[in-house]
Amino acid sequence: MKKPVVIGLAVVVLAAVVAGGYWWYQSRQDNGLTLYGNVDIRTVNLSFRVGGRVESLAVDEGDAIKAGQVLGELDHKPYEIALMQAKAGVSVAQAQYDLMLAGYRDEEIAQAAAAVKQAQAAYDYAQNFYNRQQGLWKSRTISANDLENARSSRDQAQATLKSAQDKLRQYRSGNREQDIAQAKASLEQAQAQLAQAELNLQDSTLIAPSDGTLLTRAVEPGTVLNEGGTVFTVSLTRPVWVRAYVDERNLDQAQPGRKVLLYTDGRPDKPYHGQIGFVSPTAEFTPKTVETPDLRTDLVYRLRIVVTDADDALRQGMPVTVQFGNEAGHE
């Protein structure tokens, strides 16, 4: 074969290889990464925070619920009574604290001073009587028992005088700081009990925390529940998340904020739109639910993809194909 012909064939082959490589690269760029996942199953068990008898339930299995909707109520009467008791406790504690702060009135101080004078007079009389009895005892005019009775009366009068003096001193100086602090602490305790009673009454009504669909209703009216007992199981419908897994080789394509297209078997020509919201920082072995055979034994990273245009046709647990094409990434 002539040399020019050989060179020509080599050029043709090289051009074909280059063209093929370019076509493969371009095709890969156009098609992008494809992952397989499922719409995340998100359920929550709803319960009353307090216990009691179920008075009414407003929804049944299959009903759509909205955030803030009343779902059920316990018998409120026990909690209303507890609330009234707590309010009364606050009133008593407040009155006692106010008395401690205000101190004693002038009339009370005057009465205490009069009591001191009376006790002083009684003591003086008892002391004088005891002194006379001592003289009579020395002359053996009275018995030892008479002298002991006089001493006892004197000591009792002295104790009464001291008590009256202490009371007057307290009235004039006001209440001790420790007594005021104790009264304040009692008031704060009563206020905390009132807040707890108000919260318990509020929690005897079950409110939907978010939108969703009621899956199960575990009890009926008349049931006596312990606190925390499950009443409903709710499937959360918003937001809708897709759980998918990516291997380390393609991890750089799955960045938070990256937009993707989501395909389901029911509408293969009309994709949903999503955005990667979370990429797990740790690798894990591929879960059994992943449908891609070549990822079965790989270490992968979990993705959470938020569906931005979800509708009722996108059900929890549904398999989804995640497409990372250029069109999705730059929308």
Swiss-Prot record:
According to its UniProt record, where is this protein mainly located? Answer: periplasm
Q: Which InterPro entries match?
A: CusB_D23, UPF0194_membrane_YbhG, UPF0194_transport
Transmembrane stretches, start-end = none
The reply to whether Coiled coil figures as a keyword in the UniProt entry is yes
Compartments in which it is found:
Periplasm
Signal peptide positions (record): 1-15
Keywords for this entry?
A: Coiled coil, Periplasm, Signal
Q: Name one GO cellular component term.
A: periplasmic space
* Lineage top rank: taxon: Bacteria
Please give the Gene3D superfamilies that the UniProt record associates with this protein: 2.40.30.170, 2.40.50.100, Helix hairpin bin
Q: Which SUPFAM superfamilies match?
A: HlyD-like secretion proteins (SSF111369)
Q: Which residues form a coiled coil?
A: 107-208
Q: Which Pfam families does the UniProt entry name for this protein?
A: HlyD_D23
Q: Which PANTHER family match?
A: EFFLUX SYSTEM COMPONENT YKNX-RELATED, UPF0194 MEMBRANE PROTEIN YBHG
Which family would the database say this protein is a member of? Answer: Belongs to the UPF0194 family.
What this protein is called in its record is UPF0194 membrane protein YbhG
This protein's species is Escherichia coli O139:H28 (strain E24377A / ETEC)
